[in-house]
């Protein structure tokens, strides 16, 4: 196997613990496995980011003779150690359950009737997730302050916290106790937190070396578990692929003070493209005072531009948001090509009970609403305001989908299912969002037009935070590094000069601003777009 100098330096390192910043497609897994092979006398734990990556690693491990290496996700490790199989588990806490627990607590403990508003329930749910992903132990005002600093909260949610801090902490304790005592289902992050808190179980794991993959997207509680060990540690990740801060992920590569190595050459695409991408993104990272990207590629040519896409061969469409993906779907579905969805069609919020319920809410057919949380709202406008206040992007995407296409959504769903295939090899077009494409690669890629650009970054009237801009640029980078041979890049508008009277910043208006457009103008824009994208007239 031919290795780069960067890879050889890591494999031959005499440092006991260190971190590796590896660009997309730079062979980080191969590097780690080669390092493990050279240190096969050690008992090694390889922490994979998720189950699918664990399966992929187990397949790669067959080529290596490493009987002393164990591959696991950190949740699987915690599940067995903490005996989480004794709990009934759920991937997510339902708002209705939180509301019921709080109402019952107030009635039995404080002897008063109390019915929390939806925004308050959403706040408690978010706080539970924050606590379970943090390394903090105490449930106190320090936790609340930390939550406020790490979350971009709207004015209404901030007001709820500031006016009700004591009650918020009390209800947070109530929900956590209900999970611990098996009154309600426990989340997977909850038993991970329980594992972290139980130092007798979570410290001194029986390994000489722990390899932590995707270190840019792990949580503080995961970092805490690894750092509590007395063995050697190696963290590997890509700082430019940190795209999960909304799940309270932390970039361990920036947080952990260890000797550092870099893998800057990608084996995925040509060096010509690597330099274009590096220069384009760095011009925007620089505006945001972010760390510059350094990346190189292979001695091959990767073609840039839609005119190079061969539509007779398989290609992949990557969008920033679910709604952006729907727009691309509507455009391509008329070509009668076979389509495939990364992660499965059902994992996208196109047509499910939530979409149906919101559609019927708009139609004022409340008797047909099946989702309890949506029953709390009288109109779709109320739900939209709630989604903006709580930054519920899933609801906002669905509302935009319904407002744009009306009852066309049923026809769109029917068309998709007509051409849907379940085997990727059979597809003419692969559809995915950036987050679902992470870790994957394609011969040909088309990026949708819903990514951030210079227009939004330089907009001082509706200024985005440093963290938001950095993550949005990272999301662009992840999508842009999926292609091997040909790519149509989303326009970064690099020549744009900010004008405070410019109203063309559609990305900001659609994703970050709560100001409602004039209904008549909005309707005209929708009609124009539908006509352009070959959809029947909006009803």
Predicted feature locations:
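Conserved P-loop NTPase-based nucleic-acid remodeling module centered on helicase motor cores
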Residues: 51-130, 335-336, 341-346
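Conserved helicase motor core of SF1/SF2 NTP-dependent helicases
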Residues: 21-26, 30, 34, 38, ...
């Amino acid at each position: 196997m031919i290795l780069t100098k960067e890879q050889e330096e890591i494999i031959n390192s005499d440092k006991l613990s260190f971190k590796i910043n590896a660009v997309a497609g730079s062979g980080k897994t191969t590097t780690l496995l080669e390092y493990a092979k050279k240190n096969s006398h050690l008992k090694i734990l390889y922490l994979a980011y998720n189950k699918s990556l664990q399966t992929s690693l187990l397949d790669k491990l067959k080529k290596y003779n490493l009987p002393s290496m164990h591959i696991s996700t950190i949740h699987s490790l915690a599940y067995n150690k903490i005996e989480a199989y004794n709990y009934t588990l759920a991937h997510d806490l339902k708002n209705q359950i939180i509301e019921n627990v709080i109402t019952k607590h107030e009635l039995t403990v404080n002897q008063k009737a109390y019915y929390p508003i939806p925004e308050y329930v959403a706040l408690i749910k978010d706080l539970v997730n924050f606590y379970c992903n943090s390394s903090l132990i105490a449930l106190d005002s320090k936790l609340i302050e930390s939550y406020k600093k790490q979350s971009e909260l709207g004015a209404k949610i901030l007001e709820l916290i500031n006016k009700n801090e004591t009650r918020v902490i009390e209800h947070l304790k109530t929900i956590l106790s209900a999970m611990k005592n098996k009154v309600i289902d426990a989340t997977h992050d909850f038993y991970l937190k329980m594992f972290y808190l139980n130092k007798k179980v979570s410290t001194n794991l029986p390994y000489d070396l722990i390899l932590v993959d995707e270190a840019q997207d792990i949580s503080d509680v995961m970092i805490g578990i690894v750092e509590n060990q007395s063995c050697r540690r190696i963290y590997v990740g890509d700082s430019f692929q940190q795209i999960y801060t909304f799940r309270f992920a932390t970039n361990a590569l920036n947080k952990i003070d260890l000797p550092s190595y870099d893998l800057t050459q990608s084996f995925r695409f040509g060096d010509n493209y690597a330099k274009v991408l590096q220069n384009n993104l760095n011009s925007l990272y620089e505006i945001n005072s972010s760390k510059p990207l350094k990346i190189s590629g292979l001695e091959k040519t990767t073609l840039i531009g839609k005119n190079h896409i061969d539509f007779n061969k398989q290609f992949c469409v990557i969008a920033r948001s679910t709604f952006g993906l729907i727009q691309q779907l509507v455009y391509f579905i008329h070509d009668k090509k076979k389509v495939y969805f990364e992660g499965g069609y059902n994992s996208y919020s196109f047509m499910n009970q939530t979409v149906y319920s919101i559609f019927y809410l708009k139609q004022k057919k409340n008797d047909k609403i099946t989702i309890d949380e949506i029953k709390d709202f009288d109109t779709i406008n109320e739900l939209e305001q709630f989604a903006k206040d709580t930054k519920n992007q899933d609801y906002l995407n669905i509302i935009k989908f319904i407002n744009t296409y009306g009852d066309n959504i049923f026809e769109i769903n029917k068309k998709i299912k007509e051409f849907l295939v379940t085997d990727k090899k059979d597809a003419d077009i692969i559809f995915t969002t950036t987050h679902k494409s992470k870790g994957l690669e394609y011969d040909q890629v088309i990026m949708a037009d819903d990514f951030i650009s210079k227009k939004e970054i330089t907009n001082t009237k509706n200024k985005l935070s440093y963290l938001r801009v950095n993550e949005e640029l990272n999301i662009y980078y992840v999508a842009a590094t999926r292609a091997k041979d040909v790519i149509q890049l989303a326009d970064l508008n690099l020549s744009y000069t900010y004008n405070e009277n410019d109203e063309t910043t559609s990305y900001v208006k659609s994703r970050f601003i709560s100001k409602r457009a004039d209904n008549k103008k909005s309707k005209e824009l929708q009609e124009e777009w539908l006509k352009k994208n070959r959809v029947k007239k909006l009803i």
